[in-house]
């Protein structure tokens, strides 16, 4: 069965790749979960849309990555205000990579893809300063501190 991947699938490919898989794997796993579509002429247009979206998110090379790094590290302070549970410093919920990306943009920084952010743990669940790493390019990494403040 010939399919076009719409999401990243381990050991198979990336979005937009055309792959040949066994019929059962395609019908019972990939198609029901929305990880792939059947390869048709109309699907080629969807592949182009997927590729354009990937290119828009991708950093445009080493020079552009260095510019983004300078912009992120040049920000005075990046802070995020969230609801807390009393005076203990614990948060209602948690701070995710999407929240951090929005905080960077709100502080006057560039738009950063949430998948390029590395949080200290999967989510930040306490107030205070937290070290955040942004993987902009295989050779360029930006580091900054996020100040999480309780509301």
Swiss-Prot record:
The keyword Ribosomal protein applies. The gene is rplI. This is Large ribosomal subunit protein bL9. The lineage of its organism: Bacteria, Bacillati, Actinomycetota, Actinomycetes, Mycobacteriales. One of its GO terms (cellular component) is ribonucleoprotein complex. Keywords: Ribonucleoprotein, Ribosomal protein, RNA-binding, rRNA-binding. It comes from Rhodococcus opacus (strain B4). GO terms for molecular function: rRNA binding; structural constituent of ribosome. Gene3D superfamilies: Ribosomal protein L9, C-terminal domain, Ribosomal protein L9, N-terminal domain. Belongs to the bacterial ribosomal protein bL9 family. PROSITE patterns: RIBOSOMAL_L9. Binds to the 23S rRNA. One of its GO terms (biological process) is translation. It comes from the Bacteria.
């Amino acid at each position: 069965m010939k399919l076009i991947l719409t999401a990243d699938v381990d050991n198979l490919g990336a979005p937009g790749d055309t792959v040949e898989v066994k019929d059962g794997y395609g019908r019972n796993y990939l198609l029901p979960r929305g990880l792939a579509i059947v390869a048709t002429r109309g699907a080629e247009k969807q592949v182009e849309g997927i590729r354009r979206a990937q290119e828009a998110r991708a950093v445009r090379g080493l020079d552009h990555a260095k510019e983004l790094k300078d912009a992120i590290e040049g920000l005075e302070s990046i802070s995020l205000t969230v609801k807390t549970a009393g005076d203990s410093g614990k948060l209602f919920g948690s701070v995710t990579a999407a929240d951090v990306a929005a905080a960077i943009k709100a502080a006057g920084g560039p738009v950063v893809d949430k998948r390029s952010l590395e949080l200290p743990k999967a989510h930040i669940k306490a107030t205070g300063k937290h070290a955040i790493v942004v993987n902009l390019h295989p050779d360029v990494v930006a580091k900054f501190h996020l100040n999480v403040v309780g509301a």
